[in-house]
A protein has these predicted regions:
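NAD(P)+-binding Rossmann beta1-loop-alpha1 motif at the extreme N-terminus of oxidoreductases
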Residues: 2-70, 77, 207-208, 298
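Short acidic-hydrophobic, aromatic-tinged amphipathic segments that line or gate anion-handling sites
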Residues: 67-72, 174-176
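Rossmann-like NAD(P)(H) cofactor-binding subdomain of soluble oxidoreductases
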Residues: 48, 54-55, 64, 72-149, ...
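Short pre-catalytic strand/loop immediately N-terminal to key active-site residues, enriched for Gly-Thr
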Residues: 132, 181-186, 238-243
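Internal alpha-helical scaffold of NAD(P)-dependent oxidoreductase catalytic cores
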Residues: 48, 120-130, 146-184, 196-233, ...
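NAD(P)-dependent Rossmann-like dehydrogenase/reductase catalytic/cofactor-binding core
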Residues: 2-8, 12-14, 221-300
Length: 300
């Protein structure tokens, strides 16, 4: 399995003299900005952010040392690249605001709006701006994020490379076909939630057999971290790595038997399946999810 990609030459994030804008200065917006600034991919005076919540603007500006404003429209024409980090339901209003603010045709838009495809974004914008869609996850906060990206009909490979450079500032980034985005959202986008629940349950189990809670949490978290690194660094299948620690009549095989009795594989598979169905409807507002749900054609 390949390691985290490294560019031999830095990929320019914005053109000379232009700026990078971030609309939505919440957790993920601030995380991406922090990664770009700390990685020196862009200077503080070349970045601005906007958020409809004044208190969020104040907090983000203080944390990052950049301009963060509720009324950001005047800055839009100077932007060479804009990151969209708002909620999916805010997409129509934000796209209209960008268009009315004088968005330049060549400005690249990178969206992390879950469930909103590139076709939908392009339709809302009503222009031929290049659009890249991304799905990061929350471990980006500690520089260990997993992001997938794809490009819309007007975006180029160079646009995709610029997006990849941004998300590699906070972890790993892989280009994929857009048809996989609902499944990716369910697996890696929601994945930290599954992992935290599993870690919590294992820590509780440690307490049940007599361990102090903090010790149990540390043992579980470090074991999860080390196991993940073994998979990524060795390229070996998890089943082969599991066999290495499973000795005849030992503790591990006994514990695994109980997990299999509890149908852990099918429970996890059903969780991802259900989350995939929900992802398909995130960009269209509240709706009843059909039994046949899930799956989205490329660009929906």
């Amino acid at each position: 399995m390949s390691k985290k990609p490294e560019h031999t030459q830095p990929v320019p994030v914005v053109a000379e003299g232009a700026t990078l804008g971030v609309i939505g200065a919440g957790v993920m917006g601030q995380t991406l900005l922090r990664g770009l600034l700390s990685g020196k991919l862009i200077a503080h005076d070349r970045v601005w952010a906007g958020d409809k919540n004044p208190s969020t603007c104040d907090a983000a500006s203080e944390a990052l040392g950049i301009a963060v404003e509720s009324d950001y429209q005047a800055r839009v024409p100077s932007a060479d690249l804009i990151l969209l980090c708002v909620k999916p339901n805010d997409a129509p209003a934000v796209m209209a605001a960008l268009r009315n603010a004088g968005l330049r045709r060549e400005t690249l838009l990178i969206s992390i709006l879950a469930g909103v495809g590139t076709d939908r974004l392009e339709s809302l914008l009503g222009t031929e701006n290049p659009v890249v869609r991304a799905m990061p996850n929350t471990p980006a906060v500690v520089g260990e994020g997993m992001t997938v990206i794809c490009r819309g009909r007007y975006a180029t490979k160079a646009d995709l490379q610029r997006a990849q450079a941004i998300f590699e500032a906070v972890g790993r980034c892989i280009p994929v076909d857009e048809v996989h985005f609902n499944a990716v959202t369910a697996l890696s986008g929601s994945g930290p939630g599954y992992q935290f629940l599993i870690m919590e349950a294992l820590a509780d189990a440690g307490v049940r057999v007599g361990l102090p809670r903090q010790l149990a949490l540390t043992l579980v978290a470090q074991t999860a971290l080390g196991s993940a690194r073994m998979v990524l660094s060795t390229g070996r299948h998890p089943a082969a790595l599991r066999d290495d620690v499973t000795t005849p009549a030992g503790c591990t095989i006994g514990g695994l038997l109980m997990l299999e009795d509890g149908r852990i594989r099918s429970v996890l598979a059903r969780a991802v399946e259900e989350a995939t169905k929900i992802s398909a409807h995130l960009g269209v507002g509240p709706t009843k999810i059909s039994e046949s749900g899930g799956g989205q054609r490329s660009g929906d």
